[in-house]
């Protein structure tokens, strides 16, 4: 038995036509199931029990379907409705008294079941559509009635493709306002056609797109839907639409603004009309099914524009105000029935509001912001990061200063020279990586400082990779000291090889990553100056080489330790073996520390947004330099 939650997610992911076919199939399969007796869908049940159907309360038609989950009956769908052709036209009851509501209303699928009501509406009040408003507003907001109104709005939007004026829009908005009430949100869960909320949004946008204005501002305001429209003259200096609405009866008002810049308006050769609609509760109804752990945190703003306008700016005040939770600007994909991050980019964000730049088109006309419920930032994390980076930078500077002081004394042999060459370059690359990391953190984001973000991210990527590749170079030194064949290589050749490994390989990887992902705007993360993960997985260009080097180094150290046990004290190889063992110790300490550090770094991106992972990563990142920073062996000699 599929649970109600998973059935909900499955249907919502489907496009409108697919949802209709699914619901039709579900309706047919329901007819083949022998329903249990009415009024027994309560209490304990068996997990493999067949669905239970219960009759609706008096004065309503339909039924309620229950499924057994965790050995208890839970309501899955409800088709109970009081609205029908008999009640919706309250003043003409006799006209439809002989018609059965079952023959005129089908709440479980979008078909021609409400054609009679729609046709009668067009006959009775085609001028303003007002003859059904009283009947709808008096009806309870139960799931079946919501489905009836959604179907009616859908039919009206497909019937009236022209000649929509302010009066019709006023009545249409009043019908939608009734089912968008905050008190009805929980009942949307039980509507049999889970795609109803998508159809509602699409129907409202479609109907509004046919609205014709007579040169004056249109302002149709209801509690849960607000429509603004105006005619923009040619060469206008810019327009903005501001909404201020309550999400529920007890909350404060939340604002949303749509901004059209002068530059964009110049692209339209003649006067045109702009229509914008705001919904305070529709975000709670529309499920962000393809973006896990995300909730709508602002008004849903729809905008109908001429096709020449490609960019708009939107300012969303946050419903839940938090500086520790990142938001994402999104557009509603009308074909795929889901929120899509590709439609918008974040320009600026603080604890109270988010500014987005979006690209409306025939698929994207509605926009909002999503908020992750997981905390990914905190003042503690910020302090630890900057204090840790300060400690790291100071340690690295001390390390390089000590290396400079003792350089002539500790580089007398070839292998010692090469060893300290690696140590110095590890310190330099880690120092540069930390500096560029700080530069990247001070940039406000990839939208405001895109070129600066690209530059900072490139160098952070390059220098952190260089740290790992110089660690690999130190491992290669072990092989140089153990394998006789390498003794024939001149010192200059070895130095060139080390620099090729330490800087050449990271440079190639960093350049290829930038060249492949940046043209499609997939190089940077939307909210920070670092490699993208969600869209292009560019972060793998750092993760894969780094962890591969960690594994190779650990294997190399293990093999060399086994081999060096054969060298006897006083033998000709003994002194070189002692130097090699020092390198092994150094690598054996640094490699796990570096690997552990970036293992936690990966966990912060892939395995969730736990604050503990971020704090551990910041601490290890600050301390990973300390074994080399002490440089104990420099004072002991080689």
Swiss-Prot record:
Residues 1-25 form the signal peptide. GO terms for cellular component: membrane. It is a multi-pass membrane protein. It comes from the Eukaryota. Residues 26-386, 444-465, 515-541, 608-610 are extracellular. InterPro entries: Adhesion_GPCR (IPR051587), GAIN_B (IPR057244), GAIN_dom_sf (IPR046338), GPCR_2-like_7TM (IPR017981), GPCR_2_secretin-like (IPR000832), GPS (IPR000203). Glycans are attached at residues 155, 219, 248, 293, 311. Gene3D superfamilies: 2.60.220.50, Rhodopsin 7-helix transmembrane proteins. PANTHER family: ADHESION G-PROTEIN COUPLED RECEPTOR F2, IG-LIKE DOMAIN-CONTAINING PROTEIN. Orphan receptor. Most adhesion GPCRs undergo autoproteolysis at the GPS domain. ADGRF2 is not autoproteolyzed at the GPS motif because of the lack of a consensus catalytic triad sequence within GPS region of the GAIN-B domain. Belongs to the G-protein coupled receptor 2 family. Adhesion G-protein coupled receptor (ADGR) subfamily. This is Adhesion G-protein coupled receptor F2. It comes from Rattus norvegicus.
């Amino acid at each position: 038995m599929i649970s109600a939650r998973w059935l909900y997610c499955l249907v919502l992911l489907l496009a409108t036509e697919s949802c209709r076919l699914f619901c039709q199939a579900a309706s047919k399969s329901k007819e083949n199931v022998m329903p249990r007796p009415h009024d027994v869908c309560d209490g304990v049940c068996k997990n493999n029990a067949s669905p239970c159907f219960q009759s609706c309360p008096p004065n309503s038609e339909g039924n309620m379907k229950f499924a057994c989950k965790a050995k208890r009956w839970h309501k899955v769908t409800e088709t109970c409705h009081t609205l029908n052709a008999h009640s919706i036209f309250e003043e003409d009851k006799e006209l439809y008294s002989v018609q059965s509501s079952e023959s005129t209303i089908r709440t479980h699928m979008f078909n021609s079941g409400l054609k009679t009501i729609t046709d009668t509406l067009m006959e009775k009040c085609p001028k303003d559509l007002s003859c059904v408003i009283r009947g709808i507003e008096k009806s309870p907001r139960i799931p079946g009635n919501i489905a009836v109104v959604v179907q009616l709005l859908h039919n009206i939007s497909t019937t009236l493709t022209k000649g929509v004026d302010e009066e019709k829009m006023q009545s249409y908005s009043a019908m939608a306002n009734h089912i968008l009430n905050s008190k009805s949100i929980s009942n949307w869960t039980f509507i049999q056609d889970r795609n109803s909320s998508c159809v509602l949004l699409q129907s409202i946008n479609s109907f509004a797109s046919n609205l014709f204005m007579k040169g004056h501002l249109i302002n149709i305001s209801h509690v849960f839907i607000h429509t603004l429209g105006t005619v923009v003259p040619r060469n206008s200096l810019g327009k903005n639409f501001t909404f201020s609405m309550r999400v529920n009866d007890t909350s404060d008002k939340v604002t949303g603004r749509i901004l059209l810049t002068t530059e964009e308006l110049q692209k339209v050769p003649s006067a045109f009309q702009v229509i914008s609609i705001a919904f305070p509760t529709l975000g709670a109804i529309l499920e962000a099914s393809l973006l896990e752990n995300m909730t709508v945190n602002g008004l849903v703003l729809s905008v109908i524009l001429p096709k020449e306008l490609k960019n708009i700016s939107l300012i969303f005040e946050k419903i839940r105000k938090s500086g520790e939770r990142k938001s994402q600007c999104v557009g509603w994909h009308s074909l795929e029935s889901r929120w899509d991050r590709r439609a918008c980019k974040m320009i600026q964000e603080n604890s109270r509001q988010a500014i987005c730049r979006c690209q409306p088109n025939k698929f994207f006309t509605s926009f909002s912001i999503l908020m992750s419920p997981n905390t990914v930032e905190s003042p503690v994390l910020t302090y630890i990061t900057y204090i840790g980076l300060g400690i790291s930078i100071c340690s690295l500077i001390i390390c390089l200063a000590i290396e400079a002081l003792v350089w002539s004394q500790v580089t007398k042999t070839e292998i010692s020279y090469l060893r300290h060459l690696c140590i110095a370059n590890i310190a330099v690359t880690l120092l540069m990586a930390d500096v560029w990391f700080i530069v990247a953190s001070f940039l406000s984001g990839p939208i405001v400082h895109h070129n600066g973000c690209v530059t900072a991210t490139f160098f952070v990527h390059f220098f952190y990779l260089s740290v790992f590749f110089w660690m690999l170079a130190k491992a290669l030194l072990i092989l140089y000291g153990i394998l006789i064949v390498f003794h024939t290589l001149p010192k200059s050749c070895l130095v060139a090889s080390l620099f090729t490994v330490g800087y050449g390989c990271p440079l190639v990887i960093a350049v290829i990553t930038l060249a492949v992902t940046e043209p499609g705007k997939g190089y940077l993360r939307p909210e920070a100056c670092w490699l993208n993960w969600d869209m292009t997985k560019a972060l793998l260009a750092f993760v894969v080489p780094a962890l591969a080097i960690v594994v190779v180094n650990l294997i190399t150290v293990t093999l060399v330790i086994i081999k060096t046990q054969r060298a006897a004290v006083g033998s000709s190889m003994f002194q070189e073996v002692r130097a090699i063992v020092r390198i092994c110790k150094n690598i054996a300490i640094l490699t796990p520390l570096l690997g552990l550090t970036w293992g936690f770094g990966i966990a912060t991106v892939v395995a969730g947004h736990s604050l503990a992972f971020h704090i551990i990563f910041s601490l290890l990142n600050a301390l990973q330099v300390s074994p080399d920073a002490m440089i104990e062996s420099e004072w002991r000699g080689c």
